[in-house]
UniProtKB/Swiss-Prot annotation:
Changing residue 19 to Y: Loss of function and acquisition of resistance to metronidazole. Belongs to the nitroreductase family. This is Oxygen-insensitive NADPH nitroreductase. Pfam families: Nitroreductase (PF00881). NADP(+) binds at residues 150-155. GO terms for molecular function: oxidoreductase activity. Changing residue 49 to K: Loss of function and acquisition of resistance to metronidazole. Its EC number is 1.-.-.-. GO terms for biological process: response to antibiotic. Changing residue 64 to N: In strain: 69A. Keywords: Antibiotic resistance, NADP, Oxidoreductase. Changing residue 31 to E: In strain: HP500, 69A and ATCC 43504 / NCTC 11637 / JCM 7653 / RPH 13487; resistant to metronidazole. Reduction of a variety of nitroaromatic compounds using NADPH as source of reducing equivalents; two electrons are transferred. Capable of reducing metronidazole; inactive RdxA renders the bacterium resistant to this compound. The reduction of metronidazole generates hydroxylamine, a potent mutagen and bactericide.
C-alpha cells in the first residue's frame, strides 16, 4: 500500500475548501460517481450503526427543485455536478430489537454488539429518543467529513450545506424516496476559481498538548 508523503498530505489539506461555485459544464463520469458513493458507504460510525442513507442527485431538474429551497445556496447547487442528500435514520430504527439493528450485523458480531449498544442507550442516553436522534446526526456528520475529504483526494470539490428547508426538500424527494429525514446536503463538482487563502486558528489557540 502506498501512502502520500507529508508534503502532499499537507497540500491536499490546505487545498480542500468549501467550494461556493462549481463548473456547471463539468459532468461526473460513472466511475467518479461510483467512487464517491463508495467513500460514503465506507464511512465509520459508532457501533458500526451506519444510521444513514445517501441519495446522489445528478438530474438537473431535480437539483433545481431542491436548490429552490436552499435559501442563499441556490445558484451554487445548480452549478454543482451532483448533489448528495445525506438522510438520517429515525431513532426508532436504531432500537436494539428492531428490524434494522437485527439485520445489520453478521450473527457473530450481533451477539456482541447489540447487548453493548442496548446498555449504552440506557447508561448514556437514559433511553431518550431525543438524545438518540442527536447521536444519529453525529454519525451522519462523521460520514460527511469523510466524503468531503475523499472527494478532495479525487481532485474534486465539495461544499457542505446546512442552509435549506428540510421539509420542502423532503417533499421534492418523497415521490422517489419514502419520507426522507434529511441531515444535510453536499454539493459536488469541480471548482471554477482557485480557493481563497485558508483561514484557521493558530496551533496555539487550536491545540493543547498534555
Amino acid at each position: 500500500m502506498k501512502f502520500l508523503d507529508q508534503e502532499k498530505r499537507r497540500q491536499l489539506l490546505n487545498e480542500r475548501h468549501s467550494c461556493k461555485m462549481f463548473d456547471s459544464h463539468y459532468e461526473f463520469s460513472s466511475t467518479e460517481l461510483e467512487e464517491i458513493a463508495e467513500i460514503a458507504r465506507l464511512s465509520p460510525s459508532s457501533y458500526n450503526t451506519q444510521p444513514w442513507h445517501f441519495v446522489m442527485v445528478t438530474d438537473k431538474d431535480l437539483k433545481k427543485q431542491i436548490a429552490a429551497h436552499s435559501y442563499f445556496n441556490e445558484e451554487m447547487i445548480k452549478s454543482a455536478s451532483a448533489l448528495m442528500v445525506v438522510c438520517s435514520l429515525r431513532p426508532s430504527e436504531l432500537l436494539p430489537h428492531g428490524h434494522y439493528m437485527q439485520n445489520l450485523y453478521p450473527e457473530s458480531y450481533k451477539v456482541r454488539v447489540i447487548p453493548s449498544f442496548a446498555q449504552m442507550l440506557g447508561v448514556r442516553f437514559n433511553h431518550s429518543m431525543q438524545r438518540l436522534e442527536s447521536y444519529i446526526l453525529e454519525q451522519c456528520y462523521i460520514a460527511v467529513g469523510q466524503i468531503c475529504m475523499g472527494v478532495s483526494l479525487m481532485g474534486l470539490d465539495s461544499c457542505i450545506i446546512g442552509g435549506f428547508d428540510p421539509l420542502k426538500v423532503g417533499e421534492v424527494l418523497e415521490e422517489r424516496i419514502n419520507k426522507p429525514k434529511i441531515a444535510c446536503l453536499i454539493a459536488l463538482g469541480k471548482r471554477v476559481a482557485e480557493a481563497s487563502q485558508k483561514s484557521r486558528k493558530s496551533k496555539v489557540d487550536a491545540i493543547t498538548w498534555l
